């Protein structure tokens, strides 16, 4: 029996999963894309159509992930790289997952997920982000939620500028959030109780969405979760920076800059690979990032915000760092204007474990230092009258599938979704991890705000915020705050560049 969607002038047919406890609706188009390098147009009316939401939808063209980053079991790896079809103009779709049979007036808390992948890869159809297990757990513990995953444009298709404007993938994300606000009540969700979540580039996107929502009247989100990324991780670059990228793309494709929109999906992706684009940057174009946006960096109007990171985030860069000789790494440090200070602070010296020290710098300079700064700013805002609560989470528990990978970047995603066949202990930890976010969605404290949460040594504990230095190098962060961080970032980038 199709589900009626009055606000969309449509009905919809989906799938039943989790032994009948959960319903899932795939490939719901939330926006139309008029053309390459164009803003999405919110899709509000289906003209009475019945939507077939039983099959996976198109994803943005992207390079295939070459190795098993998460060390998931072999029988699951191909499902991680699910072979969906790719289309740069049809990829604005989303997944809604909900408890079976929820009524339209249920007003369940709604959780929205934005995946990571450096703005060049990733998909809502990746098994790692499969939400049915989280929704089933929400039912089991009596805190049922509606969950939404948003697909968006990636790579040059999503972030190459045109006439000084850009951020097409970012506009997609925001339009998806607007769709949730307008239409999630048809699925039993509460548009006034939305928790926005994301990891890595998805966490940066959460920060971007909060800034935009703050400037537009704070209507879309009540709570947020930022896992390993703030706007400082992928900072908006000026139009001149993006204009240089346009020129490079034109050169490798043999096109004029004015004709780049005529490139096919394949030609754009080939250009991206030839230029070795490892991260796609947003653009400070005065459009998505409106004048004055820097005054809205601290989302101190939210009810609650969780900021989390992993102990060994820098393991993301293990391959390029490990591929270099110690002498090469030392030479890069010596050449930097902040090299002497960084060498002393991290112990990047002859006779030491140079590669591990470089990965520690990558951990701080790309992710954890910025998390620390945002947490401090939120705490300061609280002291100055903000009613928002901020919660700090440290994920130091190693990858349950391969502990040798340590608590690497994105290992927390495994615990968030619990979709990769953990052993009994890993499953228990994952359910505990999920409980924090379900409590948040229900307006409850995920843990005592006077403490921070930490996953390590096979378990979970809370420690007073005054003891954060036991699990994070707070003194090192303070030393970094006194340096020219632009130079620190350039050195960090150089260390992982072959």
Curated annotation (Swiss-Prot):
UniProt-recorded Gene Ontology molecular function terms: triacylglycerol lipase activity
Pfam families: COesterase
Gene3D superfamilies reported for this sequence: alpha/beta hydrolase
Glycoprotein listed as a keyword: yes
Glycan attachment sites: 193, 384, 418
Sorted UniProt keywords: Disulfide bond, Glycoprotein, Hydrolase, Lipid degradation, Lipid metabolism, Signal
Record organism: Yarrowia lipolytica (strain CLIB 122 / E 150) (Yeast)
GO process terms (BP): lipid catabolic process
The enzyme's E.C. designation: 3.1.1.3
InterPro entries tied to this protein: AB_hydrolase_fold, CarbesteraseB, Carboxylesterase_B_AS
Domain of life: Eukaryota
Active site: 200 (acyl-ester intermediate), 409 (charge relay system)
The protein's name: Lipase 3
Annotated family: Belongs to the type-B carboxylesterase/lipase family.
Intrachain S-S bonds: 60-91
Keyword Ribonucleoprotein annotated: no
SUPFAM superfamilies assigned to the protein according to its UniProt record, in alphabetical order: alpha/beta-Hydrolases
Catalytic reactions on record: a triacylglycerol + H2O = a diacylglycerol + a fatty acid + H(+)
